Amino acid sequence: MLITVYCVRRDLTEVTFSLQVNPDFELSNFRVLCELESGVPAEEAQIVYMEQLLTDDHCSLGSYGLKDGDMVVLLQKDNVGPRPPGRAPNHPRTDFTGSGSAVPGTSSSRHPHPHQHHHHQHQRIPSTQQAHGLASGENMAFAQDLNSPALIRSMLLSNPHDLSLLKERNPALAEALLSGNLETFSQVLVEQQRERAMREQEMFRLYSADPFDQETQARIEEEIRQQNIEENMNIAMEEAPESFGQVAMLYINCKVNGHPLKAFVDSGAQMTIMSQACAERCNIMRLVDRRWAGVAKGVGTQRIMGRVHLAQIQIEGDFLQCSFSILEEQPMDILLGLDMLRRHQCSIDLKKNVLVIGTTGSQTHFLPEGELPLCAKLLSGAVQEDSSDKEVAGSIKHPVKGPGRKKH
């Protein structure tokens, strides 16, 4: 038979779920099943049916008159003693995302019991008036304590899962939390709660305004659009979390004039470039033709000092002809652009994680993150460093030569 359980926890949060059990199922076992769903310890659970408290744990549910489709109420007892080891109070439902959406629950995955089948589960936060007379003075004080910044901070620091979610979805609050300053954390938390309250008030005003007013309709449309964006992001976090990670750029080992280098493979760049510092280390600055000087413009600008028309680059055991445009300032030593990749019919095989040299048939593996140059590693400042790399790559996509210089 299917029994619906309406649970009211000690902190006044509610949860409703359904259990598939047999009529001869004992009340003690039923409490355990409810604990798996609600998180309320079995010894603290009070089961009420038809305004009657069920007390005999050895009686079956059928003996109490329960039948298919009935509903029971589960009340959590007041805290009468120390909580068993390993149990923690339910976390407060605070806006930890900074955008009005709550972090998903942190309870562990539930395993189906042989006598139960989960049909649905829904959680919400009741107001004091919605507690159906179950809010005692202690419950109210406990609920207020759950909104304490100090308690929230200690809960987050003691729960690695919640902390990782906070870092991912609300970096500002996570930074304040990890600063170790309770006052800073409280200020950020209170400010975000205030902003959320203001958004809720604004939404109330929008939905209570004249529905035929054009300005109101435009604001409601924008709010719906933002909600769709937020929902799309939350779905992406659940279904494709890898899309929020940073991807290591494609680098290979090579040699120029006998000097080992790490080359950035960029099929989106028009030409192969080398930094001035790298050219000096490789002793090819003497070959730079300064008649090809100019400015590379794209996302940013870079000064082109000149061009080395012909040099050799060694990839694995192959020696390949290559030309380099020398840039005055850039973080990368060398960037292999489309001119070199096309000339040697190179192909990027991401499945095998190799660069295939079409003219020779040889291949070389892309470097793992640990072997990348410092400017390409995914560190705390990786976003800024990656932007610098992108700026250089974007600059050379549309090079602008100096006056009277022939394009190549």
Swiss-Prot record:
GO biological process, one term: regulation of DNA stability
Matching InterPro entries: DDI1_N, Peptidase_aspartic_DDI1-type, Peptidase_aspartic_dom_sf, Ubiquitin-like_dom, Ubiquitin-like_domsf
An MF annotation (GO) of this entry: aspartic-type endopeptidase activity
Pfam families assigned to the protein according to its UniProt record, in alphabetical order: Asp_protease, Ddi2_HDD, ubiquitin
Highest taxon of source: Eukaryota
Ranges of biased composition (kind: Basic residues): 110-123, 398-408
Positions annotated as active site in the UniProt record: 266
Enzyme class at the top of the EC tree: hydrolase
Region spans: Disordered: 77-135, 386-408
EC number: 3.4.23.-
Keywords associated with the record: Aspartyl protease, Hydrolase, Protease
Family statement drawn from the similarity comment of this UniProt entry: Belongs to the DDI1 family.
Name this protein carries in UniProt: Protein DDI1 homolog 1
Species name: Rattus norvegicus (Rat)
